[in-house]
Amino acid sequence: MKTTTRIIISLVGALLLLVLSYAQFNSPKPGPLGNEKKIIATADRLKLSPKQHVSYDDSIVMIDVHYDKTLLPVYDSTGYCLGTTPITDRGKILALLRQLQQSNYRYIIMDVFFEQGDVTPYDSALFALIDDMDRIIIPIHNFARQNSLIPIEKTGLADYETTKKESSFLKFPYIVGSTASIPLKMYQQLGPNHSTIQRHSGLFYTDAGHLCRRSVFLVMDMAKMLTEYDGEDNYYIANADRYTLGYDALGMPPDTNEMAFPLLDTGSYDGKYVIIGDFEDDVHNTYRGSQPGPLILFNAFLALLHGQHHVSILFLLILYVIYTILFWILLGKQKLKDSLVRGIRNPVVKRLTATIVSLISYTLLLEVVCVITYWRTGKVYDLITIGAIFTILSNIYHYTYDVVQIQKNKLL
């Protein structure tokens, strides 16, 4: 192959793979081989964990609704009562929000779902109060209908995608179609001016002029890990305050009309992120073990606040250079391993180098890039899939090259 042709193919091929890489960064689904989790595991083994961000442990108050349920009758289309279903006690939610309205809270994440058709005597007052409050967000889900009385501007998506290969939570999508997630709506209100994720030309996303991605692999140990583990993938809340809704926050013991002394007053919420949700049942498998859903949402917000979704132009330029070099090697007469030992004259050194190089592949080289990037920036990018593509292209090219050479030799 002529040098000029080889250069052009290398430059164009590298550009195409760079665009493919960015598209994969934006995908709401984890890598096809669970590559992101592999990158974290490799970095942990090598003790190359990035520096953690400023702790938010003393800036949150967690309200657990797990023990505050009420039974709601369920009827069929004829009006026959089929039984009951437990829902979060909306009377206690209303009482808590009235208390919060008197405080100077920073933001409320109320990870409590109000499904269409579930009706209680408190709904009118509760939803009117939610509409009247500032800096409060409630989840919606693609698989269920939200109560139509909830103002749409006070809701955000709280879903994520998995694959057959990887069923655990890995990546959080900040925007799906035109629907913004809970963390993104929080970021729009609390982040720097004009903070949001905007789509351009069907592929590219920006945040206030910065190239970014709409989906991020969450580094769950952000903020000094709001949860810790007992060694068996069971979590417990660490370095943060968690209270039950009825007993601790409202002073209302369960199954009784008696009043107790609440542990919290209006001043307890001043300047705090108030996270309301079920910390016992609403748990999800992650690469760090089980995590409660409300804290996943908060971690996703912190990732935005610290620019984890931003994609550095310098990083893309470095990646483009790496891809170009790998394409140049791929299009050579020799395979990657042979190219790396070419030019070594000392037979002992050459043999030793060949042994080491025999373990090297395109996938391994790009995995090293992933680990170094995570170590230096705290951001996880899946380049291992691109490494697999390089390997496939290399095998196809050299197989075709060998076939052509054999045919030429036969003609001679």
Go through each PLM region and give its residues:
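Flexible inter-domain connectors and hinge/loop segments
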Residues: 2-323, 391-412
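Juxtamembrane interface at the cytosolic side of transmembrane helices
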Residues: 325-364, 369-375, 401-406
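Loop-to-transmembrane alpha-helix initiation sites
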Residues: 375-388
